[in-house]
Amino acid sequence: MRTNRRGFTLIELLIVVVIIGILAAIAIPKFANTKEKAYLAAMKSDLRNLATTEETYASDKLGVYGDETQVGFTGSAGVVLVVTPNGGLGWSAVATHASTTKECVVYVGVPTAIPTLTNPPATVPPVREGEPTCDIL
């Protein structure tokens, strides 16, 4: 008497495991930089909001820019902003995040020094006036 066996053979199971491994090898690198991109987005957003706050402050103070404490700006969680005003001529700011080594910079007008990035993108000028620029991933 012959019994019908049910189930998968070892070869079938190995093929499934190999297919899952290939899919994982494709998907994991795509999502590996997701957190890093989120940190950079938070820093860029804070720099844009800081620029708006600086301009509002300067319009109230007859064109004189202030640092982050004077203008009353608080960044997102984990983001540290260092603003260097140059009186009524301009200002610059550097944003860092506690969870990444990357940084973002911005300047407006004539700052005391134009900020530089440690790893600037090659496709654009390292820093353009009024436009937050970040290190590349």
Model-derived features: where do they sit?
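Short, intrinsically disordered, low-complexity terminal segments
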Residues: 21, 35, 90-92
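Periplasmic/extracellular, small/polar-rich flexible segments of pilin-like filament-forming proteins
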Residues: 48, 52-137
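Aliphatic-rich helix starts adjacent to a transmembrane/signal segment
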Residues: 30-47
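Short, contiguous, well-ordered secondary-structure segments
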Residues: 1-2, 56
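N-terminal single-pass transmembrane signal-anchor helix
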Residues: 2-31
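Hydrophobic transmembrane-helix microenvironments that flank and shape a buried ionizable site
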Residues: 9, 43, 51-52
